[in-house]
Every structure is written in structure tokens, then in C-alpha cells.
Amino acid sequence: MQRPLTIALVVDSLSNFSNGTANSAYQLARELTGRGNTVRLIGVGAPDAQYRAREQQIPVATWFAHRQQTCFARPSALLFRRAFKDADIIHIYEPFSFGRHARDYALSHGIPVTAGFHIQPENIMYSLGVCRFIPGLSSAIYTGLYHYFYKKIPHIHVPTQMEADFLQRRHYRNALHVISNGYQPDFSPGYDAGDSIGAEEDTDAGAAHSPGSAQSPCTGKKFVIAAAGRLNREKDHITLIRAIGKCRHNKDIELRIAGTGPLYKRLMSECRKQLANTASVGFRKHSEMPRFFGEADLMVHPSIADIEGVSVLEGMACGLVPVIASSRLSAAGDFALTGNSLFPAGDSETLAQRIDWWIEHPEDLHTWGRKYAEYACRHYNIARCARDFELMERAAIRDAQGNGPQQHA
């Protein structure tokens, strides 16, 4: 039996629970602790006061970071000495100044380091307005991140094969471990997802509302469409709003978007123009998200750029059928199990057709909802993801002890 590990997770911002990176770190820490390991979270807003960092104020960059509900942590050798004492390995989430100094401190003290690739260059580019169209900017960001941060780290955690392929094409020489961020067990469909195989024959089960149990429009019940994500350009909620405006069943649809961000006013203005019913758009605590998805009939994920799209997994785990934008910059489309769950990114006409189809086929919606819940449970539950993450950490420790690099997928 292998001995438990002491793992330090380094994250710039741990204080904002609308930040997907922070949520992923917290849920991974809980699961790793449940496996018998000791986990320390280090960063701004860390739960243990002795591991809390101060925020670093960087002109312009801090303003952009706050718009993304995050911040930069200030490097501190005293903090690293305290947090890394007796640690077996350090895992760094973000390739900024705090992460780079943590990397250098750990390596200089003989502590193995791994890192995650969670910052998609396109997420940075879409914050730059028209500057995002500068030719070669994406490749330049990938190259810059490699030389600034990742080059010295042998093992990198990548949430999806799509992003691993991007890194390999851009000559990242690290061992890339493709491991989903997973979802928490709080996200469930209200029945045993493991029993969903063959459930197609039981379409009348459960009188209470459950995801995918929508009635036909003539019943008067609103058909609830859920979406979740930052209110930024690359998340493209504007396409979803315009699609609902083009739906035959516009008057039967209620839109709910969980998220905050700089486009709030613009999106609300578009909702008033396009939608027959009042939309709900705003921040939701992560603890409220299982209920948020559980009250919906369909999930739409219009994002143009996503390394993974954990909110899609969470919706699927609750038994929602997703309709996902197909984009070369988004891995979320790989979750689709049927063609009616995909539409070309930015195409509001096709998205409207998909929404109308699911509204008019409630039995298919119910059946596919069960299939999606079972698929998420089988492949993306957090227990499996934490196990694979721990295997990566142990491989990195072995390599640091001189046993040679190992590539994992």
C-alpha cells in the first residue's frame, strides 16, 4: 500500500467561488483528502490563514483580472517556506508571477513540481477587444507561457485531449496528463445514473419534475433553458438569446443564465429585445448550481472557447441534455452524444432549430437526459479524476527521484 502524500495546491485566487479554477481546486482538495492525503491550498483567500497570500496589484492587468472574477497573488518566500514545509510535491494552477516564484522556490529546495494548463490563450485574447485579431497572437501566447513558466515543469495536467493536442502542436515537450476536472457528487439527476442504461422504456417514471421531463408547450408550463458561464465575449450568450428570439416556441421558454461579467448590461438589453418572457441572469453560488440545473429542461452551452466546460458536465450529471456550440477552440463539443446536441458556434438559426426540436420531442429529451447522466457518471466523476491526478503526482515524484519520465494520457 502506498503512503499518503502531502500535496500543496498553488492557486492565485481562492476567494471567489464564481471562479472555475478556484472551484476545481477546492473539489480536488476535498477528494484527495478523502483518499487519505494531506492537501494545502495556497493563495489569496486560502481557507487556512497561514497559507493565505496577499493580492498583487498590477497596473491594467489587475483591472482585467477583476473583470474575470479573479486576482493575482503576491509571491512571498516566507509563505512558500511555511506552505511547502515537508510537502511531497507542489501543483501550480496558473502560470503567473505567483506560480512562477512558487515553482522556482520548490525546485531550488528539491521539491517536485507539477502544473495545470487551465488558462486558454483565447480567454485572454477575447478580453483585448479588436487586438485579438492580431495574426499569430494565440501562438505567441502559447510560446510565451512555455518559456516563462511551463518549460521547467516535466509533468502538466491538461483537462482535455483537445488542449493536449494544441500543446503538442506548439512544441510543448512535457509529459501531458489528460485528466478531466470532473464534477462533484452533489450534481445528480435524482435517480441512480448507473441505472440509466435501458431506462428508455421507463419514460413515465417519476411524477415530480426532473431534468429532461418537459411537458409539451400546450400545457402552459414554461420550458426552462439553463446556461452557465462568465458573461464574456467568448462565452457567446448573445447567440443563445438571439436563438430563443427566433424559436417557434419563444413564448414558452424561460431563460436562466448563471454567471457574472462585463457583458451583463448588454445581455439584459438583448433579452428585453428578443425574449417573450423575462430572463434570469446573475451570480449563483456554486452550492446552488445542482438545484439550478435540476429545475431546468435543457442546457445550452454557446461558448466559442473552452478548455473543458465543467458546467456542461455538471448539467449532464443532473440529467440535462446539453446543446453545445461546435468550435475548434472548445472541447465541450466532445461531450455531445447525438447530433441534436451540437450547433455551429455563433449560428443562432441552427441553435433555434435544435431548441425547437427538443421542445417538440419530450420523450427523446427524457431518454437522452438519462443517457447523458449515465455517461457523465461513468467517465467524469470527481473520484476517478482525483485518482488519476494522484497517479500523476506519484509519477512526477518518481521522476524527480531519477526513475525517468513517463508519458500519461
Task: Annotate each PLM feature.
Residues 337-349, 357-362:
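Conserved acidic donor-binding segment of nucleotide-sugar-dependent glycosyltransferases
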Residues 95, 304:
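Aromatic "clamp/platform" in nucleotide-sugar-dependent glycosyltransferases that forms part
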Residues 43, 136-205, 209-211:
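Donor nucleotide-sugar binding/catalytic pocket of nucleotide-sugar-dependent glycosyltransferases
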Residues 360-395:
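A charged, aromatic-enriched C-terminal amphipathic alpha-helix characteristic of glycosyltransferases
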Residues 265-284:
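Nucleotide-activated donor-binding/catalytic signature segment of Leloir-type glycosyltransferases, i.e.
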Residues 321-325:
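Short hydrophobic beta-strand element within catalytic cores of glycosyltransferases
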Residues 198-202, 208-209, 215-245, 256:
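Conserved donor-binding/catalytic core segment of Leloir-type glycosyltransferases
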Residues 84, 150, 283-284, 291-296:
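Short alpha-helical donor nucleotide-sugar binding micro-motif in glycosyltransferases
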